[in-house]
């Protein structure tokens, strides 16, 4: 489930900002509605996607960052596992790391996860 399109980082090796443009965040309400619909249809795992997924900031709720979004998804009945792809180490907050310990539905760090840290960024 895409929550962010584009990127604002402009890493020297990366074409994403030039090909996909600046970051555009989906509204929190739209994401949560899509998660609820997926859970109601029997989907038990939600994977959040974005060029830098953990840089999420809801355009429709100034208090909703990536941690708050994951917490809201965690509270949706039917969701058993939450995964995310392409986080950037710079955007991991202490609050999110604490949420990873506290919320059992958040999948742990996986070797398949694509991260700039793995690409020597």
What are these regions (language model features)?
Residues 1-29:
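Canonical Radical SAM [4Fe-4S] cluster-binding loop centered on the CxxxCxxC motif
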Residues 18-47:
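Conserved alpha-helical substructure of the radical SAM core
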Residues 40-121:
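Conserved SAM/AdoMet-binding glycine-rich loop
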């Amino acid at each position: 489930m895409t929550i962010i399109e584009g990127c604002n980082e402009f890493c020297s090796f990366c074409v994403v900002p030039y090909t996909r443009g600046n970051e555009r965040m989906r509204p929190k309400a739209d994401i949560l509605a899509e998660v609820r619909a997926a859970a109601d249809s029997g989907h038990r795992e939600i994977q959040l996607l974005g060029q830098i997924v953990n840089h999420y900031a809801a355009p429709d709720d100034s208090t909703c960052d990536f941690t708050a979004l994951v917490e809201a998804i965690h509270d949706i009945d039917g969701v058993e596992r939450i995964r995310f792809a392409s986080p950037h180490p710079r955007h991991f907050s202490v609050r999110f790391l604490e949420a990873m310990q506290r919320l059992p539905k958040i999948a742990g760090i996986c070797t398949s996860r694509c991260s700039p840290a793995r690409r020597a960024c």
